[in-house]
Amino acid sequence: SMSSLMESKGYYVGVDVEESSIRVYNESLYYANIIGYTGKISAEEIQSLNTDSGENKYDTTDIVGKAGLEQYYEKELQGVDGKKTVYVNNLGKVLKEDSQVDPQTGDDIYLTLKTDWQKAGYQLLEQYVAGIVWSNTYDYKEFDNSQVGTNEIVIPVYDIYYALFENNVLSVSHLRSSEATELEKKVYNMFLDKKAQLFADLKAELISDSAKPYNELSKEMQAYITYLLDTTMTELGILREDAIDTTDSTYLAWTNDESISLRDYLTYAISKDWMDITQISTDTQFLDSDEIFSSLCDYLSEYVTDDNNFSKIVYRYMIENDQLSPQIECQLLYDQGILEPDDATYQGLGDGSVYSFDFIKDKIYNLEIKPASLGLSPCSGSMVITDPNNGKTLACISYPGYDNNRLANDMDEEYFSELVTDKSSPFYN
């Protein structure tokens, strides 16, 4: 216990017990967009805040506002650190206290917002947005909304099937984990087969003397190629972004006109030293272009196996091409614990007695799948309520919210990354 440690400090060299404070936000989901959060100060913030204050008030140990009111009222909320100078022996025992400066708390800020109104307004907003999604979802694979007015927007149910993977409702990493269920393992093996086929097709395209121009490839193949070039090969340093001449006619034919093949573009890139092929193989001196491209495909295929963003593209086209049925995808919502167990419905999805379209609409209607989770349009909203007698703001609501407790103090980096990439943009509503 803390008291026993304090009593035995002399026996534990370097061990001490200190009291510390952490920031805790009540009702975080409803207030996060207003209050923001705090975090450890950065070097840039130290320089900026010290310049603004005209003194060296901040150092590397400080916690400062990172967003919302916490950031806007940083100067008012930030107190003054206390200091104590002591002399200790080699066991850490205090021998003498030399000086002490007591800490000072910052100013308090009071809001006119009413928590009950915030919560009620948030729930109403969520229900309203869910109602729009529910009423505009149709049993279509695709629909051209450019031909209709804004009040006639259609959400094809397949957009929802895609969104379950694309917006991280379903975890692609869990499908390949050691804790995966039998159904998840089955789906992952389907993914591996699909990935093997797409890289075989890509390799065939790269070594073909009659390779198609980019604009004649399928949208699916274009999606894979775009990701592999713009993201994977650039991140790995295979495609040297800083070496590419963006005014080159061949580069423009690839990026703007889309009139040349991937084979022609990469062959040219190698000749211009835009590619570092030593990353693919250490013995490249005697390889011809076909062997280089074959090695490249094998290398990329292995590398992207654990790339969640690439996996999402593959799963999307598995669904679109009916290689992964919506029925199975809906069952995964139970396997991954997104939905509460329901054996009858799970079995019905498996034998076809429960139709995936009806299932999805029912889950949206009952808010078991929420608009923010899908990140489709619409997926957000806002509401402001004021007192007509005095103009005070009683509620200032933004949907969706987030848990700012997971960002304050010791930041949850994985959660922060999820928020940044979330298609419902919780940071910006």
PLM features per residue range, with description:
Residues 1-428:
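Periplasmic/cell-envelope proteins involved in peptidoglycan metabolism and beta-lactam response
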